[in-house]
A protein has these predicted regions:
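Amphipathic alpha-helical transducer elements in NTP-driven molecular machines
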Residues: 4-5, 44-45, 68-71, 78, ...
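Conserved G1/Walker A P-loop phosphate-binding module
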Residues: 1-64
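Solvent-exposed alpha-helical segments within well-ordered globular domains of core cellular machineries
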Residues: 24, 72, 76, 86, ...
Length: 228
């Protein structure tokens, strides 16, 4: 049996370009959990899902808010990703937060990634071609230059299998995550689930953790035990 490899995938792009719908189509998990997010149809906080690509590769997916008001949350989620997909809606092409998110990911040293052209069911071939060319010009000189631009529709499912395969190949090209060293996880969110207790989410920067491990929460110094 092949050894499992785990990576963190960040989903970036302009507001309402279909990041959350795409993640839901890929994973079956709707990452908008807040009532306000569902009512407004936009992501406000970081969302999380898991994607099993097969071949021993699993991705922890971070859905990063695309609205300009929530760029702080986006930066928080982008800090520990191994690879990213930049989502561009075919019916709108490149928009301000498309550019901003790309610049943030590039400045953070993100190495792996692909571009996803969403909502292709809403445009004709000519419009799709223009949006694709504008996106290709945008990523020149960044970590996404020369990376695949995958056209998909979360609504019809078109292109999702191609996207999964592209993500798998991109992940396999990356070095395995280092699990040595102290476990460090900057906490993005804390909430309580009935029957489970306190749940924290974030992006692991180093080390590994398992059920029963004891950790120290900083800066308070509180000692906690990990439960699955």
């Amino acid at each position: 049996m092949a050894e499992e490899r785990h990576f963190i995938l960040g989903a970036a792009g302009h507001v309402d370009h279909g990041k959350t719908a795409l993640i839901t189509a890929l994973t079956g998990t709707h990452t908008d959990r807040l009532k306000e997010e569902r009512e407004r149809g936009i992501s406000i906080e970081l969302g999380f899902a898991e994607l099993d690509l097969g071949g021993g590769v699993r991705l922890g997916v971070v859905d990063m808010p695309g609205h300009e008001k929530f760029v702080k949350q986006m930066v928080s989620g982008a800090g520990g990703v191994d690879l990213a997909f930049l989502v561009v809606a075919a019916d709108e092409s490149v928009m301000p937060q498309t550019v901003e998110h790309l610049e943030i990911l590039d400045s953070l040293g993100t190495s792996g990634g692909i571009v996803v052209m969403t909502k292709i069911d809403m445009v004709d071939e000519d419009f799709l071609g223009v949006a694709t060319e504008e996106t290709r010009e945008l990523v020149e000189g960044t970590f996404l230059e020369g990376k695949p631009i995958i056209p998909v529709s979360a609504h019809t499912g078109e292109g999702l299998d191609v996207l999964r395969e592209a993500l798998l190949q991109e992940a396999l090209s990356l070095p395995a995550r280092r699990e040595e060293g102290a476990f460090r996880l900057p906490v993005d969110r804390v909430f309580t689930l009935p029957g489970a207790g306190v749940v924290v989410t974030g992006t692991c920067w180093s080390g590994a953790v398992k059920d029963g491990d004891r950790l120290v929460v900083q800066p308070s110094g509180d000692k906690v035990r990990v439960r699955e």
